[in-house]
């Protein structure tokens, strides 16, 4: 094995450590939030409270890991490519969100037609079957914490570095693999592989949007809005007879 190959392997491992390190940091942050807020009378045994702490903690962990990595590598915050969105950027946000929704719908139909297990449900949707109001809470949480937090780490740091190392195509694909696998703890059941494959497909689009627009705000908004639309749709499905 050549020195260059070893260097490439080390770079890949480094990004894997950053990705899963961010996930671990998020879990730790969630626990610490509980430790701090519990004595203040916050009902930690309430599912809604636990969900909020988990979402906020993960976002804190992702952003903290991203900043720590940038400092470790002496990289400027500008390397995240975080810019004020232009009208064109907002157009990409709308288009990107519609594409994600279309892909999710198409893949859902395809899975129903094929002799495979149905996709596993995200744990939030499982909780919502008994407490659908939680989905209303997740709409702003997706926009404020889930989309921005995950995109800062996975696109702003991991994809940016992998694209720098290996080029756009490889960088986007490898980042999408890490992104999808990092969501494994949120799923369970026979169809978990299908769910991860769908997440991978959606992540490819988000990653492409980041490189196309060169602005982290675009994938953060697309990610957050897409999730928010899903939560709103499932809420309507659970609480009305419209679907």
Where are these regions (language model features)?
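N-terminal, membrane-interfacial amphipathic/helix-forming hydrophobic leader that caps
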Residues: 1-98, 105-113, 228-243
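Structural motif marking the loop-to-transmembrane transition
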Residues: 5-13, 17, 44, 48-52, ...
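Short, hydrophobic secondary-structure boundary micro-motifs
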Residues: 78-81, 121-124, 190
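Extracytoplasmic/periplasmic mature domains of Sec-exported, cell-envelope-associated bacterial proteins
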Residues: 84-91, 118-123, 185, 198, ...
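Transmembrane helix-loop-helix hairpins at the membrane interface
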Residues: 102, 130-243
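Membrane-interface interhelical connector segments
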Residues: 112-132
